[in-house]
Curated annotation (Swiss-Prot):
Residues the entry annotates as binding S-adenosyl-L-methionine: 173-174, 205, 228-230, 304
Disulfide cysteine pairs (residue numbers): 104-347
Keyword tRNA processing in annotation: yes
Comment field (misc): Reaction proceeds by a ping-pong mechanism involving intermediate methylation of a conserved cysteine residue.
Gene3D superfamilies in UniProt: 1.10.150.530, Aldolase class I
Name of the protein: Probable dual-specificity RNA methyltransferase RlmN
Originating gene: rlmN
Domain Radical SAM core: 97-342
NCBIfam families, alphabetized: PRK14461.1, rRNA_mod_RlmN
Record family assignment: Belongs to the radical SAM superfamily. RlmN family.
Database matches in HAMAP family: RNA_methyltr_RlmN
Active-site residues, record numbering mapped to chain: 90, 347
Keywords assigned: 4Fe-4S, Cytoplasm, Disulfide bond, Iron, Iron-sulfur, Metal-binding, Methyltransferase, rRNA processing, S-adenosyl-L-methionine, Transferase, tRNA processing
InterPro entries: Aldolase_TIM (IPR013785), Methyltransferase_A (IPR040072), RlmN_N (IPR048641), RNA_MTrfase_RlmN (IPR027492), rRNA_lsu_MTrfase_RlmN/Cfr (IPR004383), rSAM (IPR007197)
Organism whose genome encodes this protein: Herpetosiphon aurantiacus (strain ATCC 23779 / DSM 785 / 114-95)
Length: 363
């Protein structure tokens, strides 16, 4: 059993079965999430007999590291993992000096949603991943920053964080299609006895599964919500995102209003810009009309290239023009800063395939 799949209560129960007192669970929990131990032998304040029991009955992690890639500036790093059963997932760390380090975490191997502009969607769903496999992605990069932060800072020529400050569930997969396991990881990440990352430092992105949006609104933890919108009308959104045939824009907006009314928290609308597809001033005006009056922010994303598609990204001038129309309606609207395009680590590029061997021509 992967020990990362156990919360403190579950770990306590497991140790009780091994004839151990409950306080040992708290000790082990601190080793895993505070000291970042990845070997029972390193837990030297535990009796040797207990360490032997742990080694015989539990394992620390189940992911196999296959490949690591880092951008030339050293500030974006992507890891490819092999899960038990041979499915693969990817995780990305993005460092924003001097004080922010964001990890982009996968919640499924592949994705069933089939968005036409996304590399992960072309894989189909391979399998859900466990809460422990989600945790393991985070702990790997927390350990990496703790051990390598000083070297990264020296290379960068200025301070960088030595720990993860923000987490986005925007990697491979649809988090709300794996809600139970995903939420178990969220609770463990937030647990003060565990990883102790504030809920407001976590953001989950969904294609628009309305049940999940409503369920998130009812949760006690205030995790931020981002919604992949990408079109302001049903005809175009269904063309880009098959999920719109199940939950149309009207259903989606009702769920989002429920979320904002219940939580009083702002929702981010993600809008990938595709040349001559969804980037016209007319569509910008439709988008502004759709979201006006909502507690929201619009995040425009110039599309990042993926193999095997005729799509192209919007030119800079069209991105700027689109943004101005939305802003003119009084709506907060920014353009996402690109990170990791050269190692296929940017938004929409995660597909667990080799990264480009030659530079990508963006325009």
């Amino acid at each position: 059993m992967n020990i990362y799949d156990l919360d403190l209560k579950g770990l306590t129960a497991q140790l009780t079965e091994l004839g151990q007192p409950a306080f040992r669970a708290r000790q082990i929990y601190a080793h895993l999430y505070k000291k970042l131990a990845n070997d029972f032998a390193a837990m030297t304040d535990l009796p040797a007999a207990l360490r032997e029991q742990l080694t015989a009955n539990l394992q620390i992690g189940s992911l196999e590291l296959v490949r690591e890639q880092t951008t030339d500036d050293g500030l974006t790093r992507k890891v490819l993992w092999r899960c038990p059963g041979d499915a693969v997932i990817e995780t990305v760390l993005m460092i924003y000096p001097p004080d922010r380090a964001t990890i982009c975490v996968s919640t499924q191997a592949g994705c069933a949603m089939g968005c036409v502009f996304c590399a992960t969607g072309k894989l189909g769903l391979l399998r859900n991943i466990s809460s422990g496999e989600i945790m393991e992605q985070v702990l790997y990069f927390e350990r990496y920053l703790r051990n390598e932060g000083a070297a990264i800072a020296k290379r960068h020529g200025g301070p960088v964080p030595d720990h993860i400050t923000n987490l986005v569930f925007m990697g491979m997969g649809e988090p709300f299609a794996n809600y139970e396991r995903w939420w178990a990881a969220v609770e463990r990440l937030n647990d003060k006895q565990g990883f102790n990352l504030g809920a407001r430092n976590m953001t989950v992105s969904t294609v628009g599964l309305v049940k999940g949006i409503r369920q998130l609104a009812d949760e006690a933890l205030q995790v931020n919500l981002a919604v992949s919108l990408h079109a302001p009308n049903d005809q175009l959104r269904s063309e880009l995102m098959p999920v719109n045939d199940r939950f149309d824009i009207s259903d989606l907006m009702d769920a989002i209003r429920y979320y904002t009314d219940k939580t009083h928290r702002r929702v981010s609308f993600e809008y990938v810009l595709l040349d001559d597809k969804n980037d016209t001033p007319e569509l910008a005006a439709q988008l502004a009309s759709l979201v006006k009056g909502m507690l929201c922010h619009v995040n425009l994303i110039p599309w990042n290239p993926i193999p095997g598609t005729p799509l192209t990204r919007s030119h800079r001038e069209r991105v700027t023009a689109f943004q101005r129309v939305v802003q003119a309606a009084g709506i907060s609207c920014t353009v996402r800063v690109e990170r990791g395009v050269e190692i296929a680590a940017a938004c929409g590029q995660l597909a667990a395939i080799p990264s480009p061997t030659s530079p990508i021509n963006l325009y």
